[in-house]
From Swiss-Prot:
Enzyme Commission identifier(s): 3.2.1.4
Protein encoded by which gene: eglB
pH dependence: Optimum pH is 4.0.
Temperature dependence: Optimum temperature is 52 degrees Celsius.
Enzyme class, spelled out: hydrolase
Coiled-coil region list: none
Name of the molecule in the record: Endo-beta-1,4-glucanase B
GO cellular component, one term: extracellular region
Function, in words: Has endoglucanase activity on substrates containing beta-1,4 glycosidic bonds, like in carboxymethylcellulose (CMC), hydroxyethylcellulose (HEC) and beta-glucan. Involved in the degradation of complex natural cellulosic substrates.
Biological process, per Gene Ontology: cellulose catabolic process; glucan catabolic process
Length: 328
């Protein structure tokens, strides 16, 4: 999701067989994005505590106690490595690693999420080679942690579709070259990786390859009129299922696995029904859908309409009971 983070901080063919994955009784991945380290994107590198923050690990443990098992941790590439193929900012890396380790030490999954929309310093990433090197360097830091998941880049948009394919493949190649061979890789698509527009925009991503066969296609789906996730109203009680229908068939037709990496709805009865519609559709097709992650928790959301931050976030108090039915 694209938000004004500075403001927020202040206020039909034969289906192929999908790769098999051992599941929990419910979703394999069910969790929350933990926003903060990507805030203040207009201030690079920015000041920790002023322009951006890191998730509160105690809040994460609270969410784990409620039944969430997956936490997507967004960060900015430019803060981690001021030059794409250069060295790390050690302070930023230390803070990121600390959050990742807190999640995985608790037995949950930690998604390392480059929240850059296919850009670096505001410019579209055009060098697949540099992107591969960047991911090789980053993945090497987490190669021994089997509970880490790599998210290639958040919400590519307004980019050449072949470039999106090439960047995703470069990320996969770099991650595996780093010796990170046990982890899942979440790949994202163009047009903000929307599930409802996936078949129109991202069909070519079916050609991505991974020697470990651990690619998961991450799609995002909001339930408001324009699918942007910027309104607290939802189109209808059934819009969730409707918006993932074509993507579900694409996964089945191509023998792929998917996850909804962002979803949300407002604190009202129509949205609660719409969220249930979405999650029920994913559960009914759990041969291809591995789960979903709420947008979002994080310590700086204050009165944000989708905040899952314990213990007084609007979604934490108003939507958690709906989500608990899908936990284990």
């Amino acid at each position: 999701m694209k938000v004004n983070t500075l403001l927020v901080a202040v206020a039909a063919g034969t289906a192929m067989a999908a790769p098999q994955l051992k599941k929990r009784a419910g979703f394999t991945f069910f969790g929350v994005t933990e926003a903060g380290a990507e805030f203040g994107e207009k201030s690079i590198p920015g000041v920790w505590g002023t322009d951006y923050t890191f998730p509160d690990t105690e809040s994460i443990l609270t969410l784990i106690s409620k039944g969430f098992n997956t936490f997507r941790i967004p960060f900015l590439m430019e803060r981690l490595t001021p030059e794409m193929t250069g060295s790390f900012d050690e302070g930023y890396l230390k803070n990121l690693t600390s959050v990742v380790n807190a999640v995985t030490d608790a037995g949950a999954w930690a998604i390392v999420d480059a929240q850059n929309f296919g850009r670096f310093n505001g410019e579209i990433i055009s060098s697949a080679s540099d992107f591969q090197t960047w991911w090789k360097n980053v993945a090497a830091e987490f190669a021994d942690n089997k509970n880490v998941i790599f998210d290639t880049n958040n919400e590519f948009h307004d980019m050449d579709q072949t470039l999106v394919l090439d960047l995703n493949q470069a990320a996969i190649n770099g991650i595996r070259a780093a010796g990170a061979t046990s982890q899942y890789i979440f790949v994202e698509g163009n047009s903000y990786t929307g599930a409802w527009t996936w078949t129109d925009n991202n069909d070519n991503l079916k050609s991505l390859t991974d020697p470990q066969d651990k690619i998961v296609y991450e799609m995002h789906q909001y339930l408001d009129t324009d699918g942007s996730g910027t309104h607290e109203t939802c189109v209808s009680e059934t819009i969730g299922a409707e918006r993932v229908e074509s993507a579900t068939q694409w996964l089945k037709d191509n023998g792929k696995l998917g996850v909804i990496g962002e979803f949300a709805g407002g604190n009202n009865e129509i949205c609660r029904a719409a969220v249930k519609s979405l999650l029920d559709a994913l559960k009914e097709n759990d041969d291809v859908w591995l789960g979903a992650l709420w947008w979002a928790a994080g310590p700086w959301w204050e009165d944000y309409m989708f905040s899952m931050e314990p213990t007084d976030g609007i979604a934490y108090t108003g939507m958690l009971s709906t989500l608990e039915a899908y936990m284990n």
